[in-house]
Amino acid sequence: MKQLWFAMSLVAASLFFSANASADPASGALLQQMNIASQSLNYELSFVSITKQGVESLRYRHARLDGRPLAQLLQLDGPRREVVQRGNEISYFEPGLEPFTLNGDYIVDSLPSLIYTDFKRLAPYYDFISVGRTRIADRLCEVIRVVARDGTRYSYIVWMDMDTKLPMRVDLLDRDGETLEQFRVIAFTVSQDIGSNMQALAKANLPPLLSVPGGEKTKFNWSPSWVPQGFSEVSSSRRPLPTMDNLPIESRLYSDGLFSFSVNVNRATQNSSDQMLRTGRRTVYSSVRDNAEITIVGELPPQTAKRIADSIKFRAVQ
């Protein structure tokens, strides 16, 4: 039954992209199949995660038990760091820290968020371009580029195993083609036995769910007049900033289904100034005007972050 469901899901994904003229049908269908395979198969990946901060060796195991996802991400070198997913709860185990659990749909740490993206949503704003085929981890792979049509975002190159549709390599590139991050599989296994081997995790006692205080919901007297196509507001909040004498900060979170960023506005202080910092995929851009400090934080090129900040419009308080 699991194999039948998986096969029918792949067919459905292909049908959608065959009828959608806004994306390369074949490449779009393959990417949607990668999304389905990553969340439905029982498999184990040994991979390296390469960023500007260094290289990590990790193992990721995924299975579906009783219709629920069960996954484990384990750091293989140095101190033992582990992330466990059971259903919609993600538990973190770090040396020197009290274990805790958060709500979530999947493990994002060291895994490309692209893997879990709904490519049907991206189709109007991104091009999916077939680059050819090559071998990764001794597997023949389809190579596909994921590029925003308006040129305001980073891009991806995906190497996907032709048989299982699992990702074997994912590169995140900036607008100049420089690699910001790389996910690269060294070895992998697809087997129903992996689910059996993870039974202990299914029964393990996990740390309690961490209560995350929600921000105060209120209407803001500001909003961006421009964001890249496809981005929409996901949430907004108003909360005190402990590091700045509980100065209230207002935030709006935006996402296009692949990348995300937040717009944060607080009253300017004597220490506020214009500044820009980029670390890997993450940009922090701050500007000061109209007695307010505007900070853009997210997975955006610096030029795009600046354009969003410059577009902020303030309205008179009623």
From Swiss-Prot:
Pfam families: MucB_RseB (PF03888), MucB_RseB_C (PF17188). This is Sigma-E factor regulatory protein RseB. Keywords: Periplasm, Signal. One of its GO terms (cellular component) is outer membrane-bounded periplasmic space. The gene is rseB. PANTHER family: PTHR38782, SIGMA-E FACTOR REGULATORY PROTEIN RSEB. Its main location: periplasm. Disruption phenotype: Slight increase in basal sigma-E activity, retains acid stress induction of sigma-E. Homodimer. Interacts with RseA.
